[in-house]
């Protein structure tokens, strides 16, 4: 029974209906044409791969901000946070992470703290790698206060192919670094907004691993001082 449960744990629940549908169509195709059946089973395997939900070894420290998503650090710049969160006209450091269709799309909490506000904003579906995607695309914005008293923002952004954002958070939730909180289907972007003068530990073009890569350190500790937990 445990192995059965573990099998479902490693696949995000958002993928169940897709995998079942792909598998059913594949069996139907195979009954008529072997080659079409093979194509269908390849598509089913890719669907399983896309919705994979692996455990990660999360660095544990109240001073850390970790990557909420797998992908490439597309851009680091000063920018205004989403206006719908009511943070005013004070710029923050924005770290943008672009996810292609081969990345893990499960999103994770970037720091220990409390969720202060959430806002869903319907929008367009520009290519998520473009800078204007942060402003115009469909997005789910989350404002949190870390256990160190820092306010940070993380935003799930739909892309050219992604057409569904899932966020399981509610205002008032107490959250821990590395916890899973949602998913974006089929190519997307996640922005993280941090206070100015935050000590960043990533650079543009770097590959980030959600739940593991340290984006920033408010305390500037040495890596040997961190503890890690599997989550």
Swiss-Prot record:
Keywords: Cell membrane, Decarboxylase, Lipid biosynthesis, Lipid metabolism, Lyase, Membrane, Phospholipid biosynthesis, Phospholipid metabolism, Pyruvate, Zymogen
Any one GO molecular-function label of the UniProt entry: phosphatidylserine decarboxylase activity
A single GO BP: phosphatidylethanolamine biosynthetic process
Membrane topology term: Peripheral membrane protein
Pfam families in UniProt: PS_Dcarbxylase
Residues found modified as Pyruvic acid (Ser): 188
Protein task: Catalyzes the formation of phosphatidylethanolamine (PtdEtn) from phosphatidylserine (PtdSer).
Name of the molecule in the record: Phosphatidylserine decarboxylase proenzyme
Organism name: Rickettsia akari (strain Hartford)
The gene coding this protein: psd
